[in-house]
A protein has these predicted regions:
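Beta-propeller blade termini and top-face loops
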Residues: 1-253
Length: 253
């Protein structure tokens, strides 16, 4: 990961999987810093904030993709203190694939992490609370699973995920899917109603199950959409499995 300090672009932080570096000359030279960070990390991500140019956060997981901790520096990355090493549920088992952290530009203690879900803290990472609901597409707090990108632009927090780009203006209470109108996807399976040839459902890689009513596609479950089917005697009943057949979902519309 690499981050530039918003209020002082001469300061740049960079990480490898296990090492933390700092430049104070716009990237011409880097020095290893980060005392207090884990020495056996598998991946690290960085967050900086315009609210305080001295503060930098590091999010760390083990080589086995287990949550290692959230670490905070108040001296521009020279030393770090572990602020949260116990909330292991924050990280998914695929942190090698999806992992992100960001901080509010107006409140240095407000941070967000992303793995499978988005988590929020208002006390500098000491306690984290899940804000989104990836498995309920109709929920106001829904955003797709697998978070790769979290970043503030003004008062808007943007989230880049396997299912598109989402934005919240109220700290994660509500998310808006900015890519909702882009009807694109990678189907695993497709089923067509025997009663109504305009009724189609599809299970999509990374994007759950979708129903087409002849006019538009509507998502009715999340995760990875796999096998799907429509009741042969009732076109309003649609079914879909997620990855590995773990759960079966049903739509009645």
């Amino acid at each position: 990961d690499l981050k530039i300090v918003p209020n002082d672009p001469t300061i740049i932080y960079a990480t490898t999987a296990t090492l933390f570096y700092k430049s104070i000359d716009s990237g011409a030279n880097f020095t290893q810093v980060g005392a207090g960070l884990p020495t056996s990390a598998g991946r690290m991500a960085i967050a900086v904030t315009a609210a305080d140019s001295n503060i930098v956060y590091a999010l760390s997981v083990t080589s086995g993709n287990i949550f290692q901790g959230i670490y905070k520096s108040t001296d521009q990355g020279e030393t770090f203190t572990a602020v949260n090493t116990t909330q292991t549920q924050i990280a998914s088992i695929q942190a090698y694939y999806d992992m992100a952290i960001t901080a509010s530009p107006t409140n240095a203690n407000e941070i967000y992490t992303g793995f499978l879900n988005i988590w929020k803290s208002v006390n500098g990472g000491v306690t984290m609370t899940q804000v989104n609901n990836w498995s309920s597409p109709s929920s106001a707090s829904y955003s797709h699973a697998d978070i790769h990108f979290l970043r503030f632009y003004g008062n808007k927090l943007y989230c880049g995920s396997d299912g598109g780009i989402y934005v919240t203006t109220n700290g994660g209470t509500n998310f808006t899917d900015l890519t909702k109108s882009m009807q694109i996807g990678q189907p695993y399976k497709i089923a067509i109603s025997k009663q109504n040839s305009n009724k189609i459902i599809s299970g999509l890689q990374d994007n759950g199950g979708h129903v087409f009513n002849g006019i538009r596609w509507q998502n009715f479950y999340g995760a990875d959409g796999m096998d799907v089917g429509i009741d042969p005697t009732n076109s309003n009943l649609s079914y879909g499995f997620i990855q590995y057949g773990q759960s079966l979902y049903k739509s009645t519309t």
